[in-house]
UniProtKB/Swiss-Prot annotation:
Its main location: nucleus. It comes from Komagataella phaffii (strain GS115 / ATCC 20864). This is Glucose starvation modulator protein 1. Belongs to the ERT1/acuK family. The lineage of its organism: Eukaryota, Fungi, Dikarya, Ascomycota, Saccharomycotina. Residues 199-211 have a biased composition (Basic and acidic residues). Residues 75-88 have a biased composition (Low complexity). PROSITE patterns: PAS, ZN2_CY6_FUNGAL_1, ZN2_CY6_FUNGAL_2.
Length: 531
Protein backbone atom coordinates (compact mmCIF):
# COMPACT_ATOMS: atom_id res chain seq x y z
CA UNK A 1 0.00 0.00 0.00
CA UNK A 2 1.38 3.47 -0.92
CA UNK A 3 2.40 5.58 2.06
CA UNK A 4 0.95 9.08 2.32
CA UNK A 5 3.36 11.79 1.17
CA UNK A 6 4.50 14.55 3.49
CA UNK A 7 3.00 17.98 3.05
CA UNK A 8 6.27 19.51 1.77
CA UNK A 9 6.56 16.90 -0.96
CA UNK A 10 2.97 17.46 -2.04
CA UNK A 11 3.54 21.21 -2.36
CA UNK A 12 6.74 20.73 -4.32
CA UNK A 13 5.07 18.55 -6.93
CA UNK A 14 3.38 20.16 -9.83
CA UNK A 15 0.50 18.37 -11.54
CA UNK A 16 1.04 17.39 -15.15
CA UNK A 17 -1.46 17.34 -18.00
CA UNK A 18 -0.64 13.75 -18.94
CA UNK A 19 0.25 10.97 -16.51
CA UNK A 20 2.18 7.83 -17.17
CA UNK A 21 0.54 4.45 -17.55
CA UNK A 22 1.35 3.28 -14.02
CA UNK A 23 0.15 6.45 -12.29
CA UNK A 24 -2.95 6.54 -14.43
CA UNK A 25 -3.80 2.94 -13.58
CA UNK A 26 -3.02 3.36 -9.83
CA UNK A 27 -4.67 6.80 -9.64
CA UNK A 28 -1.47 8.47 -8.36
CA UNK A 29 -0.26 12.04 -8.83
CA UNK A 30 2.30 11.95 -11.60
CA UNK A 31 4.90 14.58 -12.48
CA UNK A 32 6.33 15.92 -15.72
CA UNK A 33 9.66 14.08 -15.51
CA UNK A 34 10.19 10.77 -17.28
CA UNK A 35 10.60 8.40 -15.61
CA UNK A 36 8.43 9.88 -12.91
CA UNK A 37 9.27 9.68 -9.22
CA UNK A 38 6.62 7.03 -8.55
CA UNK A 39 8.08 4.68 -11.17
CA UNK A 40 11.68 5.33 -9.99
CA UNK A 41 10.73 4.55 -6.41
CA UNK A 42 9.24 1.20 -7.53
CA UNK A 43 12.11 0.32 -9.89
CA UNK A 44 9.91 0.35 -12.98
CA UNK A 45 11.38 3.42 -14.61
CA UNK A 46 12.09 1.58 -17.86
CA UNK A 47 8.35 1.16 -18.56
CA UNK A 48 7.34 4.70 -17.61
CA UNK A 49 5.71 6.33 -20.59
CA UNK A 50 2.78 8.64 -21.22
CA UNK A 51 -0.72 7.23 -21.38
CA UNK A 52 -2.29 7.49 -24.81
CA UNK A 53 -5.65 9.21 -24.54
CA UNK A 54 -8.32 9.02 -27.21
CA UNK A 55 -9.07 12.30 -28.87
CA UNK A 56 -12.56 13.71 -28.47
CA UNK A 57 -14.83 13.28 -31.50
CA UNK A 58 -12.58 10.74 -33.20
CA UNK A 59 -13.50 7.35 -34.61
CA UNK A 60 -16.83 6.02 -33.30
CA UNK A 61 -18.04 9.14 -31.51
CA UNK A 62 -17.62 11.30 -34.58
CA UNK A 63 -19.21 8.70 -36.84
CA UNK A 64 -22.20 8.29 -34.52
CA UNK A 65 -22.73 12.03 -34.45
CA UNK A 66 -22.58 12.22 -38.24
CA UNK A 67 -25.01 9.30 -38.68
CA UNK A 68 -27.45 10.83 -36.21
CA UNK A 69 -27.41 14.12 -38.11
CA UNK A 70 -27.92 12.27 -41.39
CA UNK A 71 -30.93 10.34 -40.04
CA UNK A 72 -32.50 13.52 -38.73
CA UNK A 73 -32.00 15.28 -42.04
CA UNK A 74 -33.36 12.33 -44.07
CA UNK A 75 -36.47 11.66 -41.93
CA UNK A 76 -39.64 13.25 -43.36
CA UNK A 77 -41.10 13.72 -39.90
CA UNK A 78 -38.27 16.05 -38.89
CA UNK A 79 -38.59 18.20 -42.01
CA UNK A 80 -42.35 18.34 -41.77
CA UNK A 81 -42.16 19.16 -38.08
CA UNK A 82 -39.70 21.98 -38.79
CA UNK A 83 -41.77 23.44 -41.63
CA UNK A 84 -45.12 23.16 -39.87
CA UNK A 85 -43.90 24.23 -36.43
CA UNK A 86 -45.22 27.76 -36.62
CA UNK A 87 -48.62 26.77 -38.05
CA UNK A 88 -49.04 24.04 -35.42
CA UNK A 89 -48.45 26.54 -32.62
CA UNK A 90 -51.01 28.95 -34.06
CA UNK A 91 -53.58 26.21 -34.55
CA UNK A 92 -53.04 24.89 -31.02
CA UNK A 93 -53.97 28.29 -29.63
CA UNK A 94 -57.26 28.27 -31.52
CA UNK A 95 -58.01 24.66 -30.60
CA UNK A 96 -57.26 25.20 -26.92
CA UNK A 97 -59.76 28.05 -26.76
CA UNK A 98 -62.50 26.35 -28.77
CA UNK A 99 -62.17 22.70 -27.67
CA UNK A 100 -60.68 22.40 -24.18
CA UNK A 101 -61.98 18.83 -23.69
CA UNK A 102 -60.15 17.58 -26.78
CA UNK A 103 -56.90 19.06 -25.52
CA UNK A 104 -57.27 17.27 -22.19
CA UNK A 105 -57.90 13.96 -23.88
CA UNK A 106 -54.85 14.46 -26.11
CA UNK A 107 -52.62 15.12 -23.11
CA UNK A 108 -53.73 11.88 -21.46
CA UNK A 109 -52.83 9.72 -24.45
CA UNK A 110 -50.55 6.85 -23.33
CA UNK A 111 -47.01 6.69 -24.60
CA UNK A 112 -46.57 4.58 -27.70
CA UNK A 113 -49.94 5.57 -29.13
CA UNK A 114 -49.02 9.04 -30.43
CA UNK A 115 -48.09 7.72 -33.88
CA UNK A 116 -51.32 5.80 -34.44
CA UNK A 117 -53.53 7.71 -36.92
CA UNK A 118 -57.08 8.43 -35.84
CA UNK A 119 -59.72 7.68 -38.46
CA UNK A 120 -62.67 10.08 -38.26
CA UNK A 121 -66.13 8.62 -37.92
CA UNK A 122 -68.00 8.72 -41.25
CA UNK A 123 -71.13 10.11 -39.61
CA UNK A 124 -69.42 12.88 -37.65
CA UNK A 125 -70.17 16.40 -38.82
CA UNK A 126 -67.60 18.49 -36.97
CA UNK A 127 -64.49 16.42 -37.44
CA UNK A 128 -62.88 19.04 -39.66
CA UNK A 129 -62.60 21.44 -36.72
CA UNK A 130 -60.18 19.09 -34.97
CA UNK A 131 -57.62 19.13 -37.78
CA UNK A 132 -55.62 21.63 -39.73
CA UNK A 133 -56.80 22.54 -43.27
CA UNK A 134 -54.13 20.34 -44.89
CA UNK A 135 -54.87 17.37 -42.66
CA UNK A 136 -58.62 17.85 -43.01
CA UNK A 137 -58.34 17.82 -46.79
CA UNK A 138 -56.24 14.66 -46.67
CA UNK A 139 -58.81 12.83 -44.52
CA UNK A 140 -61.72 14.03 -46.63
CA UNK A 141 -60.14 12.73 -49.83
CA UNK A 142 -58.98 9.41 -48.41
CA UNK A 143 -61.61 8.59 -45.83
CA UNK A 144 -64.18 7.35 -48.34
CA UNK A 145 -61.80 4.84 -49.89
CA UNK A 146 -60.54 3.75 -46.48
CA UNK A 147 -64.02 3.29 -45.04
CA UNK A 148 -65.07 1.33 -48.13
CA UNK A 149 -62.16 -1.04 -47.56
CA UNK A 150 -63.07 -1.40 -43.90
CA UNK A 151 -66.66 -2.21 -44.78
CA UNK A 152 -65.51 -4.88 -47.20
CA UNK A 153 -63.15 -6.50 -44.65
CA UNK A 154 -65.32 -6.20 -41.52
CA UNK A 155 -68.86 -7.68 -41.37
CA UNK A 156 -71.73 -5.38 -40.65
CA UNK A 157 -72.37 -6.84 -37.21
CA UNK A 158 -68.77 -5.98 -36.33
CA UNK A 159 -69.38 -6.14 -32.59
CA UNK A 160 -68.51 -9.84 -32.77
CA UNK A 161 -65.01 -10.83 -33.82
CA UNK A 162 -64.64 -13.72 -36.23
CA UNK A 163 -62.51 -16.62 -35.04
CA UNK A 164 -61.49 -19.95 -36.47
CA UNK A 165 -64.12 -22.09 -34.90
CA UNK A 166 -63.42 -25.38 -33.24
CA UNK A 167 -67.02 -26.45 -33.25
CA UNK A 168 -69.04 -25.82 -36.41
CA UNK A 169 -72.33 -27.71 -36.72
CA UNK A 170 -72.51 -29.62 -40.00
CA UNK A 171 -75.43 -29.14 -42.34
CA UNK A 172 -76.63 -32.64 -41.62
CA UNK A 173 -77.57 -31.62 -38.07
CA UNK A 174 -79.53 -28.50 -38.96
CA UNK A 175 -82.85 -30.19 -38.24
CA UNK A 176 -81.56 -32.07 -35.21
CA UNK A 177 -84.20 -32.31 -32.55
CA UNK A 178 -81.80 -32.12 -29.64
CA UNK A 179 -79.30 -29.60 -31.06
CA UNK A 180 -75.88 -28.73 -29.69
CA UNK A 181 -74.65 -27.31 -26.43
CA UNK A 182 -73.15 -23.85 -26.92
CA UNK A 183 -73.39 -24.17 -30.71
CA UNK A 184 -72.23 -20.84 -32.08
CA UNK A 185 -72.99 -19.50 -35.57
CA UNK A 186 -70.56 -20.51 -38.25
CA UNK A 187 -67.38 -18.49 -38.14
CA UNK A 188 -67.55 -17.82 -34.41
CA UNK A 189 -65.91 -19.54 -31.50
CA UNK A 190 -68.01 -22.09 -29.68
CA UNK A 191 -67.54 -20.37 -26.31
CA UNK A 192 -68.63 -16.93 -27.60
CA UNK A 193 -71.39 -15.46 -25.45
CA UNK A 194 -70.95 -11.77 -26.21
CA UNK A 195 -67.82 -11.46 -24.11
CA UNK A 196 -66.22 -8.10 -23.38
CA UNK A 197 -63.04 -7.19 -21.61
CA UNK A 198 -63.28 -6.86 -17.80
CA UNK A 199 -62.28 -3.22 -17.79
CA UNK A 200 -64.37 -2.27 -20.78
CA UNK A 201 -67.63 -0.35 -20.35
CA UNK A 202 -70.08 -0.20 -23.19
CA UNK A 203 -72.60 2.62 -23.02
CA UNK A 204 -75.54 3.34 -25.25
CA UNK A 205 -75.55 6.27 -27.70
CA UNK A 206 -77.82 8.18 -25.33
CA UNK A 207 -75.20 7.99 -22.61
CA UNK A 208 -72.62 9.50 -24.96
CA UNK A 209 -74.91 12.41 -25.74
CA UNK A 210 -75.55 13.09 -22.03
CA UNK A 211 -72.21 13.62 -20.25
CA UNK A 212 -73.95 14.08 -16.93
CA UNK A 213 -75.24 10.52 -16.81
CA UNK A 214 -73.65 8.53 -14.01
CA UNK A 215 -73.09 4.96 -15.20
CA UNK A 216 -71.85 3.89 -11.79
CA UNK A 217 -75.27 4.16 -10.17
CA UNK A 218 -77.33 0.94 -10.31
CA UNK A 219 -80.49 2.54 -11.66
CA UNK A 220 -78.77 4.33 -14.52
CA UNK A 221 -76.70 1.25 -15.37
CA UNK A 222 -79.78 -0.98 -15.51
CA UNK A 223 -81.62 1.50 -17.69
CA UNK A 224 -78.67 1.75 -20.05
CA UNK A 225 -78.34 -2.04 -20.11
CA UNK A 226 -82.02 -2.56 -20.97
CA UNK A 227 -81.82 0.11 -23.66
CA UNK A 228 -78.71 -1.49 -25.17
CA UNK A 229 -80.22 -4.97 -25.09
CA UNK A 230 -83.47 -3.89 -26.72
CA UNK A 231 -81.58 -1.91 -29.35
CA UNK A 232 -79.33 -4.89 -30.14
CA UNK A 233 -82.23 -7.34 -30.27
CA UNK A 234 -84.20 -5.12 -32.63
CA UNK A 235 -81.19 -4.90 -34.91
CA UNK A 236 -80.76 -8.68 -34.94
CA UNK A 237 -84.39 -9.40 -35.70
CA UNK A 238 -85.29 -6.51 -37.98
CA UNK A 239 -82.07 -5.95 -39.90
CA UNK A 240 -82.28 -7.57 -43.33
CA UNK A 241 -78.46 -7.58 -43.63
CA UNK A 242 -78.02 -10.37 -41.05
CA UNK A 243 -77.46 -13.58 -42.98
CA UNK A 244 -77.32 -16.92 -41.20
CA UNK A 245 -75.36 -19.65 -42.88
CA UNK A 246 -76.65 -22.29 -40.45
CA UNK A 247 -80.26 -22.97 -39.61
CA UNK A 248 -79.29 -24.02 -36.09
CA UNK A 249 -77.60 -20.67 -35.48
CA UNK A 250 -80.65 -18.83 -36.78
CA UNK A 251 -83.08 -20.73 -34.56
CA UNK A 252 -80.80 -20.33 -31.56
CA UNK A 253 -80.51 -16.59 -32.12
CA UNK A 254 -84.28 -16.22 -32.49
CA UNK A 255 -84.89 -18.17 -29.29
CA UNK A 256 -82.33 -16.10 -27.43
CA UNK A 257 -83.85 -12.87 -28.75
CA UNK A 258 -87.37 -13.88 -27.78
CA UNK A 259 -86.17 -14.86 -24.30
CA UNK A 260 -84.38 -11.54 -23.77
CA UNK A 261 -87.40 -9.57 -25.00
CA UNK A 262 -89.68 -11.52 -22.68
CA UNK A 263 -87.30 -10.92 -19.78
CA UNK A 264 -87.25 -7.18 -20.52
CA UNK A 265 -91.03 -6.92 -20.82
CA UNK A 266 -91.82 -9.04 -17.78
CA UNK A 267 -89.98 -8.40 -14.54
CA UNK A 268 -89.23 -11.88 -13.21
CA UNK A 269 -88.30 -12.45 -9.61
CA UNK A 270 -86.12 -15.53 -9.67
CA UNK A 271 -86.07 -15.75 -5.90
CA UNK A 272 -89.82 -16.44 -5.83
CA UNK A 273 -89.60 -19.38 -8.26
CA UNK A 274 -90.35 -22.86 -6.98
CA UNK A 275 -87.19 -24.81 -7.69
CA UNK A 276 -88.67 -28.03 -6.31
CA UNK A 277 -90.66 -28.41 -9.53
CA UNK A 278 -87.54 -28.62 -11.65
CA UNK A 279 -86.44 -32.09 -12.86
CA UNK A 280 -83.49 -33.61 -11.05
CA UNK A 281 -81.32 -36.72 -10.84
CA UNK A 282 -79.56 -37.56 -7.57
CA UNK A 283 -77.01 -40.32 -6.99
CA UNK A 284 -77.03 -41.82 -3.48
CA UNK A 285 -74.14 -43.27 -1.52
CA UNK A 286 -75.32 -46.85 -2.08
CA UNK A 287 -74.85 -46.45 -5.87
CA UNK A 288 -78.55 -45.98 -6.54
CA UNK A 289 -80.26 -43.22 -8.48
CA UNK A 290 -83.27 -41.12 -7.51
CA UNK A 291 -84.91 -38.85 -10.10
CA UNK A 292 -88.05 -36.81 -10.55
CA UNK A 293 -89.14 -38.96 -13.49
CA UNK A 294 -91.50 -41.94 -13.17
CA UNK A 295 -89.93 -45.10 -11.75
CA UNK A 296 -86.69 -43.19 -11.03
CA UNK A 297 -85.78 -43.29 -14.71
CA UNK A 298 -84.20 -40.72 -17.00
CA UNK A 299 -85.84 -38.72 -19.82
CA UNK A 300 -86.45 -40.63 -23.05
CA UNK A 301 -84.62 -39.62 -26.22
CA UNK A 302 -85.55 -42.33 -28.67
CA UNK A 303 -87.64 -40.61 -31.32
CA UNK A 304 -84.64 -39.22 -33.20
CA UNK A 305 -82.71 -42.51 -33.36
CA UNK A 306 -85.08 -45.27 -34.36
CA UNK A 307 -82.58 -46.76 -36.82
CA UNK A 308 -80.06 -47.22 -34.04
CA UNK A 309 -82.54 -49.23 -31.99
CA UNK A 310 -82.38 -52.07 -34.52
CA UNK A 311 -78.68 -52.61 -33.79
CA UNK A 312 -77.97 -54.94 -30.84
CA UNK A 313 -76.34 -53.32 -27.83
CA UNK A 314 -73.01 -55.11 -27.66
CA UNK A 315 -71.64 -52.90 -24.90
CA UNK A 316 -73.90 -54.38 -22.20
CA UNK A 317 -72.96 -57.97 -23.06
CA UNK A 318 -70.76 -59.70 -20.50
CA UNK A 319 -68.52 -62.47 -21.89
CA UNK A 320 -68.78 -65.87 -20.25
CA UNK A 321 -65.00 -66.00 -19.86
CA UNK A 322 -62.41 -63.31 -20.25
CA UNK A 323 -60.27 -64.01 -23.27
CA UNK A 324 -56.69 -62.84 -23.04
CA UNK A 325 -54.18 -63.07 -25.86
CA UNK A 326 -50.75 -61.65 -26.59
CA UNK A 327 -52.09 -58.65 -28.53
CA UNK A 328 -54.83 -57.44 -26.19
CA UNK A 329 -55.24 -57.54 -22.42
CA UNK A 330 -58.63 -56.38 -21.11
CA UNK A 331 -58.49 -53.31 -18.86
CA UNK A 332 -60.23 -55.25 -16.08
CA UNK A 333 -57.26 -57.65 -15.82
CA UNK A 334 -54.76 -54.79 -15.89
CA UNK A 335 -56.60 -53.05 -13.07
CA UNK A 336 -56.20 -56.15 -10.88
CA UNK A 337 -52.50 -56.43 -11.72
CA UNK A 338 -51.50 -52.76 -11.66
CA UNK A 339 -52.45 -51.21 -8.33
CA UNK A 340 -49.45 -48.96 -7.63
CA UNK A 341 -46.77 -47.31 -9.80
CA UNK A 342 -44.17 -50.00 -9.06
CA UNK A 343 -46.34 -52.65 -10.69
CA UNK A 344 -46.06 -50.82 -14.02
CA UNK A 345 -42.30 -51.25 -14.19
CA UNK A 346 -41.92 -54.62 -12.45
CA UNK A 347 -44.56 -56.63 -14.26
CA UNK A 348 -44.20 -57.95 -17.79
CA UNK A 349 -47.85 -57.45 -18.66
CA UNK A 350 -47.29 -53.86 -19.79
CA UNK A 351 -46.13 -54.16 -23.40
CA UNK A 352 -46.21 -51.98 -26.46
CA UNK A 353 -49.87 -51.39 -27.28
CA UNK A 354 -51.06 -52.62 -30.66
CA UNK A 355 -52.82 -49.52 -31.97
CA UNK A 356 -53.11 -50.88 -35.55
CA UNK A 357 -55.07 -53.87 -34.22
CA UNK A 358 -57.32 -51.52 -32.30
CA UNK A 359 -58.03 -49.45 -35.40
CA UNK A 360 -58.82 -52.59 -37.37
CA UNK A 361 -61.30 -53.65 -34.69
CA UNK A 362 -62.81 -50.16 -34.74
CA UNK A 363 -63.19 -50.27 -38.52
CA UNK A 364 -64.85 -53.66 -38.34
CA UNK A 365 -67.39 -52.39 -35.80
CA UNK A 366 -68.16 -49.31 -37.87
CA UNK A 367 -68.83 -51.40 -40.97
CA UNK A 368 -71.32 -53.59 -39.12
CA UNK A 369 -73.21 -50.62 -37.69
CA UNK A 370 -73.33 -47.72 -40.17
CA UNK A 371 -74.50 -47.31 -43.73
CA UNK A 372 -72.28 -46.42 -46.66
CA UNK A 373 -72.94 -42.66 -46.57
CA UNK A 374 -72.13 -42.47 -42.87
CA UNK A 375 -69.05 -44.63 -43.31
CA UNK A 376 -67.72 -42.28 -45.98
CA UNK A 377 -68.24 -39.31 -43.68
CA UNK A 378 -66.48 -41.05 -40.78
CA UNK A 379 -63.67 -42.24 -43.03
CA UNK A 380 -62.97 -38.67 -44.14
CA UNK A 381 -62.60 -37.63 -40.50
CA UNK A 382 -60.36 -40.56 -39.63
CA UNK A 383 -58.19 -39.97 -42.69
CA UNK A 384 -57.21 -36.57 -41.29
CA UNK A 385 -55.48 -37.87 -38.18
CA UNK A 386 -54.78 -41.59 -38.62
CA UNK A 387 -51.82 -41.06 -41.05
CA UNK A 388 -50.36 -38.58 -38.56
CA UNK A 389 -50.45 -41.21 -35.84
CA UNK A 390 -48.81 -43.75 -38.12
CA UNK A 391 -46.05 -41.35 -39.23
CA UNK A 392 -45.42 -40.23 -35.65
CA UNK A 393 -44.98 -43.78 -34.35
CA UNK A 394 -43.17 -45.17 -37.40
CA UNK A 395 -39.75 -43.93 -36.25
CA UNK A 396 -40.16 -45.22 -32.69
CA UNK A 397 -38.36 -48.34 -31.56
CA UNK A 398 -39.82 -51.10 -29.40
CA UNK A 399 -38.59 -49.51 -26.18
CA UNK A 400 -40.22 -46.22 -27.13
CA UNK A 401 -43.58 -47.94 -27.56
CA UNK A 402 -43.16 -49.68 -24.22
CA UNK A 403 -42.30 -46.34 -22.64
CA UNK A 404 -45.43 -44.68 -24.05
CA UNK A 405 -47.62 -47.52 -22.76
CA UNK A 406 -46.05 -47.27 -19.31
CA UNK A 407 -46.67 -43.53 -19.38
CA UNK A 408 -50.27 -44.26 -20.30
CA UNK A 409 -50.74 -46.67 -17.40
CA UNK A 410 -49.02 -44.25 -15.01
CA UNK A 411 -51.27 -41.38 -16.07
CA UNK A 412 -54.28 -43.67 -15.83
CA UNK A 413 -53.48 -44.41 -12.18
CA UNK A 414 -53.45 -40.69 -11.40
CA UNK A 415 -56.67 -40.04 -13.27
CA UNK A 416 -58.42 -42.96 -11.56
CA UNK A 417 -57.57 -41.57 -8.13
CA UNK A 418 -58.69 -38.13 -9.29
CA UNK A 419 -62.05 -39.13 -10.75
CA UNK A 420 -62.83 -41.28 -7.71
CA UNK A 421 -63.14 -38.03 -5.72
CA UNK A 422 -65.42 -36.42 -8.32
CA UNK A 423 -69.19 -36.77 -8.26
CA UNK A 424 -69.55 -36.25 -12.01
CA UNK A 425 -70.08 -39.41 -14.12
CA UNK A 426 -66.70 -39.89 -15.78
CA UNK A 427 -65.28 -42.37 -18.27
CA UNK A 428 -61.78 -42.62 -19.78
CA UNK A 429 -60.88 -44.04 -23.19
CA UNK A 430 -57.88 -44.29 -25.48
CA UNK A 431 -57.43 -42.30 -28.66
CA UNK A 432 -58.79 -45.34 -30.51
CA UNK A 433 -62.00 -45.08 -28.47
CA UNK A 434 -61.40 -48.12 -26.24
CA UNK A 435 -62.77 -47.68 -22.73
CA UNK A 436 -60.17 -48.20 -19.99
CA UNK A 437 -61.77 -46.79 -16.82
CA UNK A 438 -65.06 -45.42 -15.49
CA UNK A 439 -66.64 -44.30 -12.24
CA UNK A 440 -69.53 -45.80 -10.30
CA UNK A 441 -71.60 -42.69 -11.06
CA UNK A 442 -71.34 -43.38 -14.77
CA UNK A 443 -72.41 -46.99 -14.24
CA UNK A 444 -75.44 -45.90 -12.24
CA UNK A 445 -76.39 -43.23 -14.77
CA UNK A 446 -76.18 -45.43 -17.87
CA UNK A 447 -76.82 -48.89 -16.41
CA UNK A 448 -73.60 -50.47 -17.71
CA UNK A 449 -71.61 -52.54 -15.26
CA UNK A 450 -67.87 -52.30 -14.93
CA UNK A 451 -67.63 -55.96 -15.91
CA UNK A 452 -69.44 -55.43 -19.21
CA UNK A 453 -67.33 -52.45 -20.32
CA UNK A 454 -63.86 -53.44 -19.10
CA UNK A 455 -63.80 -57.21 -19.62
CA UNK A 456 -63.59 -56.89 -23.42
CA UNK A 457 -62.68 -54.39 -26.11
CA UNK A 458 -65.49 -51.83 -25.83
CA UNK A 459 -65.47 -48.55 -27.73
CA UNK A 460 -66.93 -45.31 -26.46
CA UNK A 461 -68.92 -44.96 -29.68
CA UNK A 462 -70.89 -48.08 -28.73
CA UNK A 463 -72.48 -45.96 -25.98
CA UNK A 464 -73.53 -43.17 -28.39
CA UNK A 465 -76.24 -42.83 -31.00
CA UNK A 466 -75.42 -42.49 -34.69
CA UNK A 467 -75.39 -38.71 -34.92
CA UNK A 468 -73.23 -38.36 -31.81
CA UNK A 469 -70.71 -40.83 -33.25
CA UNK A 470 -70.30 -38.83 -36.46
CA UNK A 471 -70.02 -35.65 -34.42
CA UNK A 472 -67.39 -37.29 -32.20
CA UNK A 473 -65.13 -38.13 -35.12
CA UNK A 474 -65.49 -34.64 -36.57
CA UNK A 475 -64.53 -32.98 -33.31
CA UNK A 476 -61.69 -35.37 -32.60
CA UNK A 477 -60.20 -34.89 -36.05
CA UNK A 478 -60.18 -31.12 -35.53
CA UNK A 479 -58.32 -31.24 -32.20
CA UNK A 480 -56.12 -34.31 -32.68
CA UNK A 481 -53.08 -32.16 -33.48
CA UNK A 482 -54.45 -28.78 -32.41
CA UNK A 483 -54.23 -27.34 -28.92
CA UNK A 484 -51.82 -29.27 -26.72
CA UNK A 485 -54.14 -28.89 -23.73
CA UNK A 486 -57.45 -29.22 -25.50
CA UNK A 487 -60.70 -29.24 -23.54
CA UNK A 488 -63.88 -29.54 -25.57
CA UNK A 489 -67.43 -28.78 -24.49
CA UNK A 490 -70.17 -30.43 -26.53
CA UNK A 491 -73.19 -32.67 -26.11
CA UNK A 492 -74.14 -36.17 -27.13
CA UNK A 493 -76.85 -38.77 -26.67
CA UNK A 494 -75.78 -41.82 -24.69
CA UNK A 495 -77.34 -45.20 -25.28
CA UNK A 496 -78.25 -46.75 -21.94
CA UNK A 497 -78.05 -50.43 -21.12
CA UNK A 498 -81.83 -50.72 -21.09
CA UNK A 499 -83.51 -51.53 -24.39
CA UNK A 500 -84.29 -48.46 -26.56
CA UNK A 501 -83.38 -46.03 -23.78
CA UNK A 502 -81.31 -42.93 -24.50
CA UNK A 503 -80.02 -40.06 -22.39
CA UNK A 504 -79.05 -36.64 -23.67
CA UNK A 505 -75.93 -35.33 -21.91
CA UNK A 506 -73.68 -32.31 -21.91
CA UNK A 507 -70.08 -33.50 -21.85
CA UNK A 508 -66.58 -32.14 -21.41
CA UNK A 509 -63.68 -33.93 -23.08
CA UNK A 510 -60.14 -33.36 -21.81
CA UNK A 511 -57.29 -34.72 -23.94
CA UNK A 512 -54.08 -35.94 -22.31
CA UNK A 513 -51.03 -36.21 -24.59
CA UNK A 514 -47.85 -38.26 -24.33
CA UNK A 515 -44.26 -37.06 -24.64
CA UNK A 516 -44.57 -37.12 -28.44
CA UNK A 517 -47.60 -34.75 -28.33
CA UNK A 518 -49.92 -37.50 -29.55
CA UNK A 519 -53.34 -37.85 -27.88
CA UNK A 520 -52.93 -40.61 -25.32
CA UNK A 521 -56.23 -40.70 -23.46
CA UNK A 522 -59.47 -38.73 -23.29
CA UNK A 523 -61.31 -38.03 -20.05
CA UNK A 524 -65.03 -37.52 -20.62
CA UNK A 525 -67.42 -36.13 -18.01
CA UNK A 526 -71.15 -36.40 -18.70
CA UNK A 527 -74.05 -34.60 -17.08
CA UNK A 528 -77.64 -35.32 -18.12
CA UNK A 529 -79.63 -32.51 -19.72
CA UNK A 530 -82.98 -32.39 -17.97
CA UNK A 531 -86.09 -30.88 -19.53
Amino acid sequence: MTKPLPLEVKRSRRPTSRACKFCHFKHLQCDATRPCKNCVKRNIGDSCEDIQRRKYGSNGTKKRAQSAQKVQSDSPSASSATNAGTSAVNESKLESSELPMVAQQTQQTPRGLETIPTIPHPNAENNSSFLSPTTSQMFNTGSNTLMDQLKMSVPENNSMYQHDTLFQPPKKYENNSYGYVNAAPQGQHMFYVGYSEPGEQRASPDAEKEPGTNLNSPSSYLSQYSHTQSHTNSQLTNSPSVVYESEIAKQEELQLTSFVEAANNEELDFFDMDFTQRPFIRLLENNTMVSSYPNNSTPKFFDHSRSHGRIPNTAKEVPTEIQQDEEFTPPLILRHIIKNPDDIYLTRVVKAYQYPKAYHALTKYLKTRFERTQLIEIAKCMSKYRPSFISATKSLVENDLIFTERSFQRSLLEYESLISMSAAPTIIWRRTGEIVALTNEFSVLTGYSRMSLLSKRTFIIELMDDESVVNYFKLFSSIAFGDLNATLLTNCVLRKAAQDDYLRCACVWTIKRDVFDIPMLIVGQFLPVLD
